[in-house]
Regions:
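Short, intrinsically disordered, charge-balanced linker/junction segments flanking boundaries
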Residues: 1-2, 328-332
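Extracellular beta-strand-rich solenoid/capping regions of secreted or surface-exposed proteins
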Residues: 1-22, 32-62, 80-98, 102-103
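Extracytoplasmic loops and strand-loop junctions of Gram-negative outer membrane beta-barrel proteins
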Residues: 7, 203-204
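Structural detector of coil-to-beta-strand junctions
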Residues: 12, 34-35, 48-52, 77-78, ...
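Extracellular beta-strand solenoids
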Residues: 15, 28, 53, 90, ...
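Residue-level marker of regulatory loop/turn positions in helix-turn-helix DNA-binding domains and
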Residues: 15, 43, 58, 80, ...
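Right-handed parallel beta-helix
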Residues: 19-30, 59-75, 98-122, 134-166, ...
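Active-site-proximal loop/turn and secondary-structure-junction residues that shape catalytic pockets
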Residues: 94, 128-130, 174
Length: 332
């Protein structure tokens, strides 16, 4: 399987090698209905974003703020995950002369108070980078992040509804903060009806709110509800990072369960003081991860839903002081 990582992108708003810029109080759309000959699910459909932010030839792009934006009806390519493609998507691209400019990266990023509705593929993504080769392995040191990754990233008070794929994701960031966000009914296009011509692409997976290759990411006071069924489809996913903490979050009726600890490079992760209400399929997915701590959570569980999702186990975890309550006692 392959990922598409180059091609044409249509962006309603584009910040290219910008610094100390605030985009605020706009309504933004980028639909595909007027493009002759382009079908919704075609494999080579143009990528589209509401707001694209790109770092390339100016080194560290600092001080990007996206605040109080209403972004809707962005009809991107449902298959492509590694390009600017969705409601808000920030990427670092390979510089023309890295020795002269320094690595392309972001620092001091704030995405706050935005409403994203019917956007595809991603809802809100911060930080995909050309420099991913510097983040291999499970244990991650600070040094690669300080040179190639992203610093001081905050994603707060955003609402993502009906994203075609993933809801909210932060990538390649050192100690990012993701708080008070909602992912509602995301992954609504990761199904056989819409995701119908992927070719040899990987990626028929999507989840609610999660990090990729971050160190010490903190997710708190978020809500993920009604994530639609696919190979993942859980509310939260500690994916291939070091030291992710989920605390004081709420999840409800996500069709793939509450939380996944994803694969061999997901280490030192903690899931504590969260509430899961009627998550489906299986409450947790410890998917070949070396370790995880699941402590002091409350799980309201429907009859017949297992704690570990079938065919999503094989990993290691420690469960301490969790409360399990049968859902039938709390529904009319």
């Amino acid at each position: 399987p392959t990922h598409v990582y180059r091609g044409y992108v249509s962006s309603a708003v584009l910040l290219y090698d910008a610094a100390y810029v605030t985009v605020q109080d706009l309504e933004i759309t980028n639909h595909s209905g007027a493009v002759l000959g382009e079908s919704y699910s075609q494999p080579d459909k143009m990528e589209r974003t509401g707001v694209a932010v790109v770092a390339k030839d100016k080194g560290t792009c600092r001080g990007i703020t996206l605040r109080d934006l209403a972004i809707h009806d962005v009809n991107g390519n449902v298959y492509d995950k590694h390009m600017n493609n969705g409601g808000i998507y920030m990427t670092a691209l390979s510089p023309a002369d890295e020795a002269a400019t320094g690595p392309a990266r972001f620092a001091d990023v704030l995405v706050e108070g935005c409403y994203l509705y019917r956007v595809s593929r991603w809802g809100l993504a911060v930080g995909y980078t050309y420099a991913h080769a510097h983040f291999q392995g499970a244990a991650l040191e600070d040094a690669p992040f300080l040179k190639y990754g992203h610093e001081n990233v905050t994603i707060r008070d955003n609402y993502v509804k009906l994203a075609g794929g993933d809801g909210i994701t932060v990538m390649y960031a050192l100690r990012p903060l993701v708080e008070h966000n909602t992912a509602d009914s995301v992954a609504c296009e990761i199904n056989d009806r819409v995701y119908s011509h992927p070719g040899d692409r990987a990626g028929k997976v999507a989840a609610g709110i999660w990090p990729w290759k971050c160190k010490d990411a903190l997710f708190r006071c978020n809500e993920a509800a009604d994530t639609r069924l696919n190979q993942d489809s859980m509310a939260y996913d500690a994916d291939s990072g070091d030291g992710t903490v989920y605390e004081y979050n709420f999840s409800r009726q996500n069709e793939g369960g509450c939380v996944m600890f994803c694969l061999q490079e997901a280490i030192h992760n903690t899931f504590r003081h969260n509430v899961s209400f009627d998550d489906l399929g299986g409450t947790i997915s410890p998917s070949e991860n070396p370790d995880a701590l699941i402590a002091d959570n409350v799980f309201y569980v429907r009859d017949g839903v297992p704690f570990v999702r079938p065919q999503m186990g094989g990993g290691n975890y420690t469960a301490e002081n969790n409360t399990f309550l049968p859902l039938d006692k709390f529904t009319p």
